[in-house]
Amino acid sequence: MTMPRGRVHMPRCAIAGVEATVAETAHAFPRHSHDRFGIGVILSGGHRSASGRGLVEARANDAIMVNPGEVHDGSPLDERGRTWRMLYFEPSMFVTAASELTGAAARELELTQPVAHDPLLKRLFERLFSVAVEVPFVPDDLAREEALLELLGHLVRVHATRPIRSSSTDALGPIAQAKARIDDDPSSALTLADLAADAGMSRFQLLRGFAHEMGLPPHAYRMQRRVVLARQWIARGATLADAAAAAGFADQSHMTRAFVRLLGVTPANYAAALR
C-alpha cells in the first residue's frame, strides 16, 4: 500500500472491532490515549514516545504497543519522520482470546512493552494486516480469523500480563469522580468550578490532581472524550455536522481540528474507513 508522504490514513478493515491506520509523517502527536489496544510496526524512520512507562524509541521493524487509557505522545526521531502501520482492537477481543487460551476468565490485561523487537510478532501483524486491510487480495473470512487469533494469542502469551491493582476501587476518589462526570457527558460545557465542587476541592487542587492522576489536564481529557464520542456518532451513520454538534464541538471545523491533532486523520477519512 502506497500513500503520499506526510499523511495519516485510516483504510477500511474487514474485521469487526478492529481499526487500521497507515502513516508516513513527521507530525508530533500531543499526549493522548486510545480506548482500544494498539499494535503496530515501524516500517521506516524512528519514533519516540513518552508514557507512564518512560521514554522509548522505536525504529524500523520494531513492534509498538499501547493499552487502552494509556496516556502517551509521539514524535519522530528526526525531520525525516517515520512510517508505520497500526491496528486498534476492541478490548473485549483480547479478553476473549485470553480466556480461550487459559481456560479461565480474564477480565483485565495489559501489554507490558511499549516497544519490542519481536520478529514473530512482526510477521503475525503483517499477515493480519494483509488479509484484513488489503481485502481484495484475500477475501477469505477463515484466513482473517486464523490470522487474528494467531496474533492475539502471541500477544497474550508473550507480551501481556494481568495488571496489579494498587488499591481498592470500590469507592471512587475525588479525581475519579471528576473523570466519571466528563465520561458521562463529554459534550457538556463543564467548568473547573463544576468539577472541583463535585470533587470537594479547589480549582487549583482539581487541576493539579487531575493532571497527575490522568496524565492530562481536564480540558485535554474532555477534548479526547469528545473525539471518541464523535467517532461513535459517525459509526452510527450520523453526518459530520451532526456528530460535531452531538459531541459538543463548536462546529464541524472545530471537530476536524481535534481529529487531526489527536488522530492525524480527518473525520471524513474516519467515516470513509467505516463504509
Language-model regions: role of each:
Residues 3-106, 137:
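N-terminal regulatory/effector-sensing and dimerization cores
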Residues 183, 188-225, 235, 244-273:
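Basic/polar phosphate-binding segments, predominantly the helix-turn-helix DNA-binding elements
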Residues 127-139, 154-162, 178-190, 210, ...:
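Basic, amphipathic alpha-helical hairpins
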Residues 34, 219, 241:
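His-enriched metal-coordination microenvironments in redox/metal-binding proteins
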Residues 100-167:
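Amphipathic alpha-helical segments enriched in hydrophobic/aromatic residues interleaved with Lys/Arg
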Residues 143-150, 173, 177, 194:
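Amphipathic alpha-helical interaction segments
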Residues 161-162, 272-275:
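Short, charged, intrinsically disordered terminal tails
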Residues 170-178, 214, 223-226:
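N-terminal positioning helix adjacent to the helix-turn-helix/winged-helix DNA-binding module
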